[in-house]
């Protein structure tokens, strides 16, 4: 999906429900972090990435993603990770946020030539 001259890339409105698949380069985000803080920092960086990418302050991380981050221990986080970011409507009536972002882990064999892409949303 390359951009030709004069073509604009579509950005979704903040208030609509959308699902994207992205690759996060965790190694550069936990570089120069002490060993005992790497996995917790990786979770915080995923949260920050999702917040910036989707424009919602309420970010929820799936347990499979959390287990994958912690699978090699506290100090050896994966170098890259493929995630699916789903912006969803909040069912809770008294919540201050109308939308939240749900981050799930997407297993891939290789990270070569992967780009951010919109996915047809499927409610898991």
Swiss-Prot record:
CDD domains: Ribosomal_L31e. The modification Phosphotyrosine is found at residue 102. GO terms for cellular component: cytosolic large ribosomal subunit; cytosolic ribosome. GO terms for biological process: cytoplasmic translation. The gene is RpL31. Belongs to the eukaryotic ribosomal protein eL31 family. The keyword Ribosomal protein applies. Keywords: Phosphoprotein, Ribonucleoprotein, Ribosomal protein. One of its GO terms (molecular function) is structural constituent of ribosome. This is Large ribosomal subunit protein eL31. InterPro entries: Ribosomal_eL31, Ribosomal_eL31_CS, Ribosomal_eL31_dom_sf.
């Amino acid at each position: 999906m390359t951009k030709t001259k004069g073509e604009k890339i579509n950005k979704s409105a903040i208030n609509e429900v959308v699902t994207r698949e992205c690759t996060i380069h965790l190694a550069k985000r936990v570089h120069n972090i002490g060993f005992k803080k790497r996995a917790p920092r990786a979770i915080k960086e995923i949260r920050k990435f999702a917040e910036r990418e989707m424009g919602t302050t309420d970010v929820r991380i799936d347990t499979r993603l959390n287990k994958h981050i912690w699978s090699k221990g506290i100090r050896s986080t994966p170098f890259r990770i493929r995630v699916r970011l789903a912006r969803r409507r909040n069912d809770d009536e008294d919540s201050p946020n109308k939308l939240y972002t749900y981050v799930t882990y997407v297993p891939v064999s290789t990270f070569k030539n992967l780009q951010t892409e919109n996915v047809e949303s499927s409610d898991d």
